[in-house]
C-alpha cells in the first residue's frame, strides 16, 4: 500500500483501490496507432481508399516488433472489404497492387531485419496467418495476391544476401508458401469467377510460374482447361493488356499491368502448352489463339512510323509473341505425330508467319542476330509448309504481296517491313512454287523492284530472290506443277539482261562484293556441264564477253570511298573477270589468261600488283580443282608474268 493511502478520506481510499484493480494502474488504456489501423482495415471509413490502406501496410509491416502483431495485421488486412469480400467482387487493378505492396514489404523487412523482429520470425508469422485463412475454403482466394507478392521477393532477397541468418528455415517457409500459392490458385480458379478475379489469378500465376513444378501447373490446367485462351484474351484484347492495339495509340504514360508481365505470361503460355494433356483440344485452342494474335498484329500496321515509346512496346510484344510461337512449334515437334503435323501444323504456321509478316518492321529495326527463338520459329514454319503444304505457301505469297503498298515503301516502316519479309519468304520457296506463280507473278514483280527500288535493303532482297531463282535450275526439281525444261529456258532467256542490269548498278547501288557474287553465281550455272549450258551452249560465252567488254570500256576513274585496291572501275571489272576464269573450258583457258593479263597491264602501281596477285590466286585455285587446266596456267604464268618481272605471290 502506498504511504499516502492512509492520508486519504473514505472516498479517496475507494478510488485508489479501484485504480489498483485496473489492468493499467494509475492510468487509462489508450489505443495505439496499430489499434486504429486494425479498426481501419476491418471497417474502413468512407474516405479510406485502397491506396491509403496499402501505404499503411507498407509503412507499418517492416516496423512491427513481435509476431503476434504481424499475424494480427495480416488477418485484419485479409478481412478488409476494400480488397476482399464474400461476394468475391474485386478490382483487378487494386488487388494487383497488393502483390506489389507485399513484395515491397518483404524486400524492406529483409533489409532492416535487425535489431527488432528477425526476418525469419516475421516471415513465419505472416505465413501462419495465411495458413489460418487458407483453412477456410471460402476465403482461400484472398491469400493469392499476398502469397505471390512474398514469393516475388525471393529473387531480390537472394540478390541482396543469399545466406542470411536462418536461411535454411527461410527456405523452408518459401517452399511451403509455393505449395500454398499453387494450392490456392488451383482452388480459386475452379468454378465461375468474376472477370477481374480471373485476371488477377492469371497474372498471379504468371508471376510464380517459374517456382511451380509441372505437376502443380497441370492440376491448375485441369481445373481451368481454357487458361491458354484466357491468357491470350488478357494479353491482346483486354484493357489491362494491349487492348486490341489501342494501347499503342493512347497517350497514357502508365504501362498496363499485363504488358509489364508479358515476359512472364509468355513463359507461362509456353509451359502450359508443353504439358497440355489433351492434344486435340490443344490444337483447337491454338487455332483460335493464333487468330486473335494475327488480328492484333494487323492493328499495328495502322502506325506507319512508330514513336520511340511505341517502338519500345512493340519490341516487348514481339518477344512475347515469338516465345509463344516457339512453345507451339516445340510442342508439335515433341508430339512427333506425322498425321497430326501434316493436317494441323500448316494452318498454325500460316497464322504464325502472317503475324511475323505484320511485325517484320519491328524485326527489321532490331535485327535477328542472336534472336535464336525467332530464327527457330521462322525455320520451323517454313519447313512445315515446304514439307506438307506448298499451296498454302503460294497463297501466302499472293496475299502478302498484294497487301504491300509499293508506293509507300520508302516512307512507311510497316510497308517496308512487309515487303522485306515477303521477299525473304519468296527466296526460300521460289524453287518449289508452281511455274504459273513464278513466271506470271513473282519474277515480274522482283524484276521491277531490281530496276526501280529506291530502298537499298529492298533492292538487295530482290537480287537475292533472282539469284535463288537462277540457281534453282542447277539441280533437278521434283516439285509439282514445275516444268524443269521450261525453267531452264526461262533462266537462259533472262540471265544476260539481269547480269547487264546488275553490272550497271555498280558502284552506285551494288558493291563490288555483291556484283562479284552475282557474276560468279551466274557463271556457275551457264558454263559447261550445267543444265543451262545443255539448253544454250553459247550462253556462257555471252556472259564472258559481257564482263570482258565492261573491262575494255571501263575507265580508270577512281571509285568513291574506296581505300584498298581495286580503286578504279577498270580494276574492279577486271577483278570480276578473274573470279570466273577457273570455270572457262580447257581449250579456251590460256587465251583468256592472256586477255586478262593485258587488262591488268593497263593499270599501274598497287592496282596492278593487286590484280596480278588475284590472277595468281585464281590459277592456284584452278589447279586444286582442275589439275590439267591448272598445270597450263602455272606454266603460262612463269613464261609470261615472271619474265615481265612483275611482283607476284609465289
Curated annotation (Swiss-Prot):
Signal peptide: none
Keyword Cell wall biogenesis/degradation: no
GO BP of this protein: peroxisome organization
Motif segment (Microbody targeting signal): 648-650
Keyword Ribosomal protein: no
Gene Ontology CC, one term: peroxisomal matrix
Compartment(s) of residence: Peroxisome matrix
UniProt keywords, alphabetically: Peroxisome, Peroxisome biogenesis
Function per UniProt: Essential for peroxisome biogenesis. May play a role in triggering the protein import competence of individual peroxisomes. It may interact with PEX10.
Name of the protein described by the UniProt record: Peroxisomal biogenesis factor 8
Source species: Pichia angusta (Yeast)
Phylogenetic classification of the source organism: Eukaryota, Fungi, Dikarya, Ascomycota, Saccharomycotina
Gene name of the record: PEX8
Amino acid at each position: 500500500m502506498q504511504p499516502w493511502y492512509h492520508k486519504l478520506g473514505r472516498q479517496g481510499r475507494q478510488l485508489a483501490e479501484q485504480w489498483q484493480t485496473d489492468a493499467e494502474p494509475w492510468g487509462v488504456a489508450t489505443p495505439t496507432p496499430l489499434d486504429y489501423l486494425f479498426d481501419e482495415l476491418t471497417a474502413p471509413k468512407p474516405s479510406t481508399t485502397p491506396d491509403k490502406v496499402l501505404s499503411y501496410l507498407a509503412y507499418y509491416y517492416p516496423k512491427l516488433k513481435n509476431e503476434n502483431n504481424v499475424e494480427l495485421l495480416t488477418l485484419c488486412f485479409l478481412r478488409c472489404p476494400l480488397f476482399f469480400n464474400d461476394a468475391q467482387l474485386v478490382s483487378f487493378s487494386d488487388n494487383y497492387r497488393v502483390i506489389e505492396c507485399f513484395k515491397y514489404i518483404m524486400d524492406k523487412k529483409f533489409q532492416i531485419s535487425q535489431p527488432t523482429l528477425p526476418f525469419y520470425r516475421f516471415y513465419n508469422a505472416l505465413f501462419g496467418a495465411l495458413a489460418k485463412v487458407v483453412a477456410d475454403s471460402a476465403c482461400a482466394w484472398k491469400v493469392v495476391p499476398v502469397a505471390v507478392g512474398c514469393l516475388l521477393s525471393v529473387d531480390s532477397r537472394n540478390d541482396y544476401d543469399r545466406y542470411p541468418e536462418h536461411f535454411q528455415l527461410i527456405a523452408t517457409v518459401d517452399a511451403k508458401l509455393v505449395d500454398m500459392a499453387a494450392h490456392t490458385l488451383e482452388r480459386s480458379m475452379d468454378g465461375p469467377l468474376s472477370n477481374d478475379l480471373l485476371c488477377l489469378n492469371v497474372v498471379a500465376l504468371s508471376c510464380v510460374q517459374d517456382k511451380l513444378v509441372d505437376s502443380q501447373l497441370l492440376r491448375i490446367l485441369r481445373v481451368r482447361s481454357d487458361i491458354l485462351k484466357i491468357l491470350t484474351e488478357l494479353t491482346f484484347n483486354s484493357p489491362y493488356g494491349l487492348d486490341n492495339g489501342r494501347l499503342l495509340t493512347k497517350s497514357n504514360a502508365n504501362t498496363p499491368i499485363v504488358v509489364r508481365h508479358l515476359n512472364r505470361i509468355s513463359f507461362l503460355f509456353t509451359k502450359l502448352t508443353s504439358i497440355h494433356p489433351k492434344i486435340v483440344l490443344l490444337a483447337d485452342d491454338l487455332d483460335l489463339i493464333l487468330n486473335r494474335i494475327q488480328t492484333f498484329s494487323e492493328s499495328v500496321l495502322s502506325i506507319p512510323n512508330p514513336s520511340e515509346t511505341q517502338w519500345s512496346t512493340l519490341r516487348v510484344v514481339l518477344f512475347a509473341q515469338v516465345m509463344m510461337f516457339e512453345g507451339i512449334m516445340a510442342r508439335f515437334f515433341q508430339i512427333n505425330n506425322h498425321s497430326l503435323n501434316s493436317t494441323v501444323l500448316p494452318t498454325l504456321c500460316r497464322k504464325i508467319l502472317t503475324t511475323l509478316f505484320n511485325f517484320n518492321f519491328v524485326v527489321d529495326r532490331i535485327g535477328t542476330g542472336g534472336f535464336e527463338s525467332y530464327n527457330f520459329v521462322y525455320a520451323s514454319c517454313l519447313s512445315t509448309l515446304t514439307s506438307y503444304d506448298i499451296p498454302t505457301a503460294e497463297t501466302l505469297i499472293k496475299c502478302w504481296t498484294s497487301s504491300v503498298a509499293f508506293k509507300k515503301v520508302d516512307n512507311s516502316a510497316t510497308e517496308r517491313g512487309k515487303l522485306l519479309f515477303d521477299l525473304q519468304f519468296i527466296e526460300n520457296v521460289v524453287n518449289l512454287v508452281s511455274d504459273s506463280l513464278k513466271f506470271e507473278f513473282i519474277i515480274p514483280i522482283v524484276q521491277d523492284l531490281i530496276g526501280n527500288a529506291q530502298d537499298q535493303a529492298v533492292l538487295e532482297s530482290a537480287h537475292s530472290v533472282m539469284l535463288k531463282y537462277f540457281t534453282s535450275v542447277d539441280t533437278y526439281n521434283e516439285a509439282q506443277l514445275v516444268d524443269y525444261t521450261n525453267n531452264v529456258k526461262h533462266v537462259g532467256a533472262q540471265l544476260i539482261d539481269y547480269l547487264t542490269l546488275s553490272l550497271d548498278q555498280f558502284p552506285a547501288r551494288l558493291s563490288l562484293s555483291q556484283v562479284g557474287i552475282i557474276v560468279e553465281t551466274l557463271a556457275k550455272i551457264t558454263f559447261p556441264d550445267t543444265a543451262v549450258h545443255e539448253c544454250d551452249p553459247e550462253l556462257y560465252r555471252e556472259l564472258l564477253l559481257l564482263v570482258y567488254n565492261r573491262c575494255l570500256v571501263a575507265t580508270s576513274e577512281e571509285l568513291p570511298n574506296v581505300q584498298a585496291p581495286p580503286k578504279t572501275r577498270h580494276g574492279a571489272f577486271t577483278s570480276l573477270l578473274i573470279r570466273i576464269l577457273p570455270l572457262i573450258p580447257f581449250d579456251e583457258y590460256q587465251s583468256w589468261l592472256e586477255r586478262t593479263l593485258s587488262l591488268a597491264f593497263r593499270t599501274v602501281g598497287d592496282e596492278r600488283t593487286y590484280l596480278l596477285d588475284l590472277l595468281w590466286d585464281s590459277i592456284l585455285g584452278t589447279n586444286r580443282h582442275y589439275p590439267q587446266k591448272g598445270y597450263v596456267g602455272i606454266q603460262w604464268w612463269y613464261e609470261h608474268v615472271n619474265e615481265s618481272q612483275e611482283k607476284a605471290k609465289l
